[in-house]
């Protein structure tokens, strides 16, 4: 943590933070988390002060607006935080006396010369609103409050006290610090600022003690008697006693479960009367087309990267006469095409900014002005035209072949790798050597898997999107969808998959939605599988020669939306690696414990004694298909990625409900003779979650296939048992 603080904060800020701790007899070496919190708090105060200025007439200027007028400007905010305590009190009293206002009881962080108000600044790991009211209760109206959270929300007592750019700067800095801390596994060590406030110990007086004794529930004479009862109470058996009282009201007949009682789940997924489940992932996956540009491997700004790729493929960039191939139900194809041309022009120009003009078609695409208006409950009751919206129940869909195709393509090996993993230090102990060897085998298999390229695209895009959403709340921004890959020869390529447009993003809550319009390149003709693309408007924008063959290039356009929770999950998509690797490592560990030596190499490649391990990874023409250990690893990794990409409430519910059914099947396989009641109720709970989520529907399809194989296997075992009995 000490190294992290030194690298991320200016020396003057660190020194002031240490001086502050010294005043309270705190040791920075013993309390590095406290030192970090004070440094962050100080830096935020300086960011706010450095961004806002006043002229001699009292007119406000941002740092950008004040360029060239520095001689006539002075800071709008006086920074009190960081001064020695006695000097800080003297400054606070002087400012209050000078401006004819009351001196607050508590020491403030800033003073606003424009509003003549003292300001308290707070940083929290929790919800900004919660911490705001905690501070408000303590400080009352003696000063203004500015609360910022690492969760990317904020709460201000005066909304006009800080402009959007100032809020964006603070929130972007907090995002950056959180990402750095998480990368170095220091985030969990950190405590919130609200956790380090000192309490005051005091003895209860006679009056308060009497009030406490009077306030105990009926049945207790005083507080100490109630405390003694709670300390000695035995909670065991309480649930059983309550259930026993309810038994006359409950009528349950347990039934021993047999294989014949189990049926396939979600029979509607086979109905041809229902539409095929449409593609609804945020970005294209196996259908993506990347415009590649060889590079030296140096880091670039996303706009520069996108500009260079578009310059190389100028025929696609300069296309002005597209052919409309497919149109979504609510789309305006003319507006979408105009917006695409604006995006290309913004990326291609010489300016450093990637801001879009707020044209009428940009406003249409981003839904500007279409948000719900909040009104008071009292107004709604009096207004007869106000009514509760009917809940939107998702339409049922049937299984589609494209989900299995996506799965197959994403789990294949390619000639390029995009996976960006941190380097690890040299091995010290023998167990570390085993871990390094195992990591090498696992990463080599995953590195060139198509799914890892898609995963990194999601990580990079959501990181850029969250940063732009925080830094430019009221602006429309063009965000390139990019990646960087390395081929087998070690050559680096910048890849441009398309462009996205971010609408206004005043995201105060985690579930507040920001509109994102995506424009992605593809060589897939949407008419081949039209049921897959009802959410997209598709243009043909030209062709490319690949390996001597001409391929049409299509532009897939979609108006979409996301929120901070989904963006943060997108940034953390690398976690898909952990799930798959841990699952396969458990198998290696089990084999190693049986054989008595490390079986990593044997599982992947085999050795003199053992042949390489194989697993059932799918079906073909009604028969199980076997695959290598590496293939199984890639399949599980791809499933983890799909679980993230298509994750929603349906998938959460399906995973939780179907787990019970899986446990019953496992008990039948182990011949434990499970008993059940209300089996149909459990099926109903599972099928309620099978609506229009592609991954849920495909999982139900695979489950039914697997159940069929298990039933066949059980019949074989039963016939063997009968022969043995005879």
From Swiss-Prot:
Record keyword DNA-binding present: no
Functional summary from the UniProt entry: Plays an essential role in viral RNA transcription and replication by forming the heterotrimeric polymerase complex together with PB1 and PB2 subunits. The complex transcribes viral mRNAs by using a unique mechanism called cap-snatching. It consists in the hijacking and cleavage of host capped pre-mRNAs. These short capped RNAs are then used as primers for viral mRNAs. The PB2 subunit is responsible for the binding of the 5' cap of cellular pre-mRNAs which are subsequently cleaved after 10-13 nucleotides by the PA subunit that carries the endonuclease activity.
Organism: Influenza B virus (strain B/Ann Arbor/1/1966 [wild-type])
Coiled coil region boundaries: none
Record text on cofactor binding: Binds 2 manganese ions per subunit.
GO biological process: cap snatching; DNA-templated transcription; symbiont-mediated suppression of host gene expression; symbiont-mediated suppression of host mRNA transcription via inhibition of RNA polymerase II activity; viral RNA genome replication; viral translational frameshifting
Binding residues annotated for Mn(2+) 2, in chain numbering: 81, 109
Binding annotation for Mn(2+) 1: 41, 109, 120-121
Transmembrane segments: none
Cofactor: Mn(2+)
Record GO cellular component, one term: host cell nucleus
Descriptive protein name: Polymerase acidic protein
Post-translational modification: Phosphorylated on serines and threonines by host kinases, including human casein kinase II.
């Amino acid at each position: 943590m000490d190294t992290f603080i030194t690298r991320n904060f200016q020396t003057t800020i660190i020194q002031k933070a240490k001086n502050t701790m010294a005043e309270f007899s705190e040791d920075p070496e013993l309390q590095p988390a406290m030192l970090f919190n004070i440094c962050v708090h100080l830096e935020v105060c300086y960011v706010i002060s450095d961004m806002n200025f006043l002229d001699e007439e009292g007119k406000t200027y941002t740092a950008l607006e004040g360029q060239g007028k520095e001689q006539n400007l002075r800071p709008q905010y006086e920074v009190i935080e960081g001064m020695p305590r006695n000097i800080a009190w003297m400054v606070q009293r002087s400012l209050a006396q000078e401006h004819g206002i009351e001196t607050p009881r508590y020491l403030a962080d800033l003073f606003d010369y424009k509003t003549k108000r003292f300001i308290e600044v707070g940083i929290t790991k929790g919800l900004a609103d919660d911490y705001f009211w905690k501070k408000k209760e303590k400080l009352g109206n003696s000063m203004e409050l500015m609360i910022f959270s690492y969760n990317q929300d904020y709460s201000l007592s005066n909304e006009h006290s800080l402009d959007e750019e100032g809020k964006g700067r603070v929130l972007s800095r907090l995002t950056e610090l959180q990402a750095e801390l998480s990368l170095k596994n220091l985030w969990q060590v950190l405590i919130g600022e609200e956790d380090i406030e000192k309490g005051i110990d005091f003895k209860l007086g006679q009056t308060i003690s009497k009030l406490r004794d009077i306030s105990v529930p009926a049945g207790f004479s005083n507080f100490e008697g109630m405390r003694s009862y709670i300390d000695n109470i035995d909670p065991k058996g309480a649930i059983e006693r309550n259930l026993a009282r309810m038994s006359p009201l409950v009528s349950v007949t347990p039934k021993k479960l047999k294989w014949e009682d189990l049926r396939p789940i979600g029979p509607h997924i086979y109905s041809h009367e229902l539409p095929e489940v449409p593609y609804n992932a945020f970005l294209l996956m196996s259908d993506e087309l990347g415009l590649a540009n060889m590079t030296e491997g140096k880091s670039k700004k996303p706009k520069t990267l996108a500009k260079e790729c578009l310059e190389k493929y100028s025929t696609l960039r300069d296309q002005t006469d597209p052919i409309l191939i497919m149109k979504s139900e609510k789309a305006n194809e003319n507006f979408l095409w105009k917006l695409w041309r604006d995006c290309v022009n913004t990326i291609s120009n010489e300016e450093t900014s990637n801001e879009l003009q707020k044209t009428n078609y940009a406003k249409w695409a981003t839904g500007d002005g279409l948000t719900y208006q909040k009104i008071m409950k009292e107004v709604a009751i009096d207004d007869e035209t106000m009514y509760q919206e009917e809940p939107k129940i998702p339409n049922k869909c049937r299984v589609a072949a494209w989900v299995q195709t996506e799965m197959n393509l994403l789990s294949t090996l390619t000639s390029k790798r995009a996976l960006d993993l941190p380097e690890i230090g040299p091995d010290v102990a023998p167990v570390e050597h085993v871990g390094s060897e195992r990591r090498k085998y696992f990463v080599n298999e995953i590195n060139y898997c198509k799914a890892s390229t898609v995963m990194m695209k999601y990580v990079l895009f959501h990181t850029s999107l969250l940063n732009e959403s925080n830094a430019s709340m009221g602006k429309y921004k063009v965000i390139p969808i990019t990646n960087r890959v390395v081929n087998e020869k070690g050559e680096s390529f910048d890849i441009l998959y398309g462009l996205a447009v971010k609408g206004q993003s005043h995201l105060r809550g985690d579930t507040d939605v920001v509109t994102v319009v995506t424009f992605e390149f593809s060589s897939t003709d949407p008419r081949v599988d039209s049921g897959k693309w009802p959410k997209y408007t598709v243009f043909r924008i030209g062709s490319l020669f690949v390996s001597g063959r001409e391929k049409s290039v299509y532009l897939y356009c979609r108006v979409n939306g996301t929120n901070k929770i989904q963006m943060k999950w997108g940034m953390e998509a690398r976690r898909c690696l952990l799930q798959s690797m841990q699952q396969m490592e458990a198998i290696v560990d089990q084999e190693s414990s049986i054989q008595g030596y490390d079986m990593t190499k044997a599982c992947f490649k085999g050795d003199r004694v053992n042949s390489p391990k194989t697993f059932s990874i799918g079906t073909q023409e009604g028969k199980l298909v076997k695959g290598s250990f590496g293939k199984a690893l890639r399949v599980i990794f791809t499933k983890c990625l799909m679980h993230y990409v298509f994750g929603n409430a349906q998938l959460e519910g399906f995973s939780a409900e179907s787990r019970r059914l899986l446990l019953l099947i496992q008990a039948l396989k182990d011949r434990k003779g499970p008993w059940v009641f209300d089996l149909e109720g459990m099926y109903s709970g599972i099928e309620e979650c099978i609506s229009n989520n592609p991954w849920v529907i495909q999982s139900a399809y695979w489950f039914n296939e697997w159940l069929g194989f298990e039933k066949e296997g059980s019949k074989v075992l039963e016939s063997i048992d009968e022969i043995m009995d005879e």
